[in-house]
Amino acid sequence: MELTREEVAAPGRANLSQLLAALALGLVVFVGVPLWANDYWLNAILVPFLILSLAGLGLNFLTGFAGQLSLGAAAFMSVGAYATYNLLVRVPALPLAVDLLLGGAVSAAVGVLFGLPSLRIKGFYLIVSTLAAQFFVVWLFTRVSWFSNDDTSGVLSAPALAMGPWRIGTPASRYLFVLGVATLLFAFGVRLVRSELGRRWMAVRDMDTAASVIGIPVGRTKLLAFALSSFVLGIAGALWAFAYLGTVEPDGFNLNLSFQILFIIIIGGMGSIGGNFLGAAFVVLLPILLSNSAGALGALGIAEDQLQNLQKIVFGTLIIVFLVKEPDGLARLVQLAWQRWTAKEQE
């Protein structure tokens, strides 16, 4: 059977369209947004959106792709933040990029340490183990003054950031810095989940006993998931402290943040790279939408001081809906909508 000229050219046209779409998106996010977005959008929406997307990527490595449940995401973020802070303060000669990588490496080492129980336990018991990491790390940073450079206040001002001559002090520069780091790590994530290690993670997630039978080193595969997940979370934690909060403190990495990151991957889609953006957008925008709808909600008898409780109710309801009706999250819904739209276009 011979292919027609149109059938041969179709894949090339598709690749060209994807390339042009990627270039257009790059121009918008790297050039258009810094030029046109105001400081509120950059500081309060876009920067936390990018960092939480990155944190979702880290947790997705562990939970979405490798199937290891965790409630300690914020703990590993705090390790990365404190490690990077100490490197910046104690070894000022190191470039910022090296500080971030070393902070992520320290977080990866701690992640492997708390991942050791995964060699023996799973499910609910593993969740409890990672939850212990959350409480232990916060206690450690609160009680041991060395981590906070012997500062008695417990709240450290984030040091000024710079990469060579570039001073990262304005909202636009912080946005571009976070965007650059997120772009690199997401590109790394795409390559990783398509690699042999990514396939091993999914085999362990689906059935670790069968994975062991076919020769996959289950223990090492799980620990690599903890290491790489914590590495990304550690870098996200440093960005969270330096580019968003402006401070380094244990309260900035509480259990609520761990739940938020878990909600991101459940709502966005476990085992999905793009779903991290969708879940993070939902987590960041929902409180803003509820706050802006305070007047309309007040007419329904919902007081303004009850908005936070309403937010929790909405999150809880959506978690149940997605787990029962669509475990693959918003990413799957978007994919189905795109397939229907392209099918209509071809008719």
For each feature predicted by the language model, list its residue ranges.
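Transmembrane alpha-helices and adjacent helix-loop boundaries
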Residues: 1-347
